[in-house]
């Protein structure tokens, strides 16, 4: 599937990425290769294949959730460059 540089530029703009022309061209080719591969996978006949959610037959082994208090709030806030009461102060992003 052919992806244009304009489509890649739109994706980059939405992702807040600044890409030069060379990268737009390279990524257009890479996206096209990925979509071609997805088309090839979609064409595989899976009629007699039983659905599964994991290639492993073993269930997930999880540990029990246990609450551990390692540090007090004051100890954590003492490591912060800036705090306000019980909150970390971080730079504004938007």
Swiss-Prot record:
GO terms for molecular function: asparaginyl-tRNA synthase (glutamine-hydrolyzing) activity; ATP binding; glutaminyl-tRNA synthase (glutamine-hydrolyzing) activity. Keywords: ATP-binding, Ligase, Nucleotide-binding, Protein biosynthesis. One of its GO terms (biological process) is regulation of translational fidelity. HAMAP family: GatC. Allows the formation of correctly charged Asn-tRNA(Asn) or Gln-tRNA(Gln) through the transamidation of misacylated Asp-tRNA(Asn) or Glu-tRNA(Gln) in organisms which lack either or both of asparaginyl-tRNA or glutaminyl-tRNA synthetases. The reaction takes place in the presence of glutamine and ATP through an activated phospho-Asp-tRNA(Asn) or phospho-Glu-tRNA(Gln). Belongs to the GatC family. This is Aspartyl/glutamyl-tRNA(Asn/Gln) amidotransferase subunit C. It comes from Nitratidesulfovibrio vulgaris (strain ATCC 29579 / DSM 644 / CCUG 34227 / NCIMB 8303 / VKM B-1760 / Hildenborough) (Desulfovibrio vulgaris). The lineage of its organism: Bacteria, Pseudomonadati, Thermodesulfobacteriota, Desulfovibrionia, Desulfovibrionales. The gene is gatC.
């Amino acid at each position: 599937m052919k992806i244009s540089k304009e489509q890649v530029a739109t994706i980059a703009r939405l992702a807040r990425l600044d890409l030069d022309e060379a990268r737009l061209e390279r990524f257009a080719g890479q996206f096209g290769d990925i979509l071609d591969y997805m088309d090839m996978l979609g064409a595989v006949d899976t009629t007699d294949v039983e659905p599964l959610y994991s290639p492993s037959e073993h269930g997930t082994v999880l540990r029990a959730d246990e609450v551990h208090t390692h540090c007090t709030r004051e100890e954590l806030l003492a490591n912060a460059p800036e705090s306000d009461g019980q909150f970390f102060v971080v730079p504004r992003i938007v």
